[in-house]
Amino acid sequence: MSRIGKRIIEIPSSVQASVEGSKLLFKNSKEKHELETHNRVKITLENNQLSFQPVGEDAQSRAYWGTYGALANNIVIGLSTGFSKTLEVNGVGYKVALGNKTLDLSLGFSHPVKYPIPAGIEMVVEKNTITIKGSDKQKVGQVAAEIRSFRPPEPYKGKGVKYSDEVIIRKAGKTAKK
């Protein structure tokens, strides 16, 4: 029994939702999202409450039930409050700047790294901290992971790009022979 799928999703007044066949349409004043659901899941929208039910009793239907419940909940949260991830850049000479539709990273390579900012993503740079904001949870996480992958933190000095809440397990360096 899916505990995630059982939840009833309350849709706030700032978000409008509608069901068209197997499609769920969500929109607020700025943007809209569409969720195509599988035919093994039944969608019910009544009084700004969204619920899902599995069509069959097999494991596949129950898996889709929880998955689409979580995806719809993420879209509603994204359109009402939004998602954000914070990255920190640590290292001597490592710099971050916001260019015209690009994020310019100086990470110790022989060339600067220019990352194009995708549509629907907003970035704020303060000193060596990057804040990524957006309404799509998957896209925000993917952009943060791609930026981190340019220079992941290394365990000896902790240099690199890391999530703000990430804990780097440090290693001791070599010890000299006696």
UniProtKB/Swiss-Prot annotation:
First and last residue of the signal peptide: none
Keywords: Ribonucleoprotein, Ribosomal protein, RNA-binding, rRNA-binding
InterPro entries per record: Ribosomal_uL6-like, Ribosomal_uL6-like_a/b-dom_sf, Ribosomal_uL6_a/b-dom, Ribosomal_uL6_bac-type, Ribosomal_uL6_CS
PROSITE patterns in alphabetical order: RIBOSOMAL_L6_1
Example GO biological process: cytoplasmic translation
Any GO molecular function: rRNA binding
GO cellular component: cytosolic large ribosomal subunit
Organism superkingdom: Bacteria
General function of this protein: This protein binds to the 23S rRNA, and is important in its secondary structure. It is located near the subunit interface in the base of the L7/L12 stalk, and near the tRNA binding site of the peptidyltransferase center.
Record family assignment: Belongs to the universal ribosomal protein uL6 family.
Official protein name in the record: Large ribosomal subunit protein uL6
Lineage: Bacteria, Pseudomonadati, Campylobacterota, Epsilonproteobacteria, Campylobacterales
